[in-house]
A protein has these predicted regions:
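Acidic/polar, solvent-exposed loop/turn segments
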Residues: 1-256
């Protein structure tokens, strides 16, 4: 079988290549000589042998074009172009099949087939990062935004969608799933570990998520949130009565 790749489609992971094309040949014959061949039928469409070159035939997922025909040998060359992504089914090989018959004006030949095997494209979940400074209330984001292949394409089977978070349990704050890959992280600024951070010191929270493409292929990545310590304002307490108060003792005063 000829093989094409969904990754070669416009949104595919290798869109700059030519993976969506396949090339091959088929041969017509007649015991009485090739001059007797009148027409060829491909996928139910009959074309006169003299008009075969340049003819295009539609398949389930792409098109087959006859690019040459040698009337001496009976060999025809074709190009197949995958034009859309398929719906992938587990344990099933996706194919586009073309049936062919030759006719000499009185009878059809036995049926032959051209089978194009279609290789599925996959999504690419990319690790995410976000940051929040001590004293800040919250940060938000969406982990699907950067889930692209190296060529900045999402993969042929679009749209991609969010599946789930492995866990939303947080150590230094509260993590909320806001839907469709979105999240909100609220920092607990009263947490002892957060308050204990020196200026520039960090803590990290990591969350794992799963996304999928339109035909169900899944991929997993992580979101890492970095908490950065800031310089806390010092406090000062004045207590005039600390040494034993008498008349004229002043009220206790505190400076932030």
């Amino acid at each position: 079988n000829d093989v094409v790749y969904e990754s070669g489609l416009a949104a595919g992971s290798a869109a700059a290549g030519n993976g969506e094309f396949a090339y091959g040949t088929f041969t017509v014959s007649d015991a009485d000589g090739l001059d007797d061949i009148d027409s060829v039928t491909i996928n139910g469409t009959t074309t006169a042998i003299g008009s075969l070159v340049g003819s295009t035939f539609s398949g389930a997922s792409g098109t087959l074009t006859v690019t040459s025909y040698d009337s001496v040998t009976g060999i025809a060359e074709y190009t197949y172009e995958l034009t859309k992504a398929t719906t992938d089914v587990d344990l099933v090989t996706e194919t586009d099949v073309f049936t062919l018959m030759a006719n000499d004006g009185t009878a059809d030949s036995a049926q032959a087939k051209i089978t194009i095997e279609i290789t599925d494209d996959i999504p690419n979940a990319v690790d995410d990062t976000n940051s929040i400074a001590e004293g800040t209330a919250s940060v938000t984001g969406n982990v699907l935004t950067n889930d692209l292949h190296a060529n900045t394409q999402p993969g042929a089977d679009t749209p991609t969608s969010f599946v789930s978070w492995a866990s939303t349990s947080a150590t230094y704050g509260t993590f909320t799933n806001t839907g469709s890959g979105g999240y909100k992280y609220e920092l607990d600024n009263k947490n002892a570990d957060v308050q204990g951070l020196d200026d520039g010191e960090t803590l990290e929270e990591t969350f794992t998520y799963t996304m999928k493409d339109a035909d169900g292929d899944e991929d997993t990545a992580t979101l890492k949130i970095t908490i950065t310590g800031t310089n806390d304002v010092p406090g000062l307490t004045v207590d005039p009565d600390a040494g034993g108060g008498g008349e004229g003792a002043h009220d206790r005063q505190e400076c932030p």
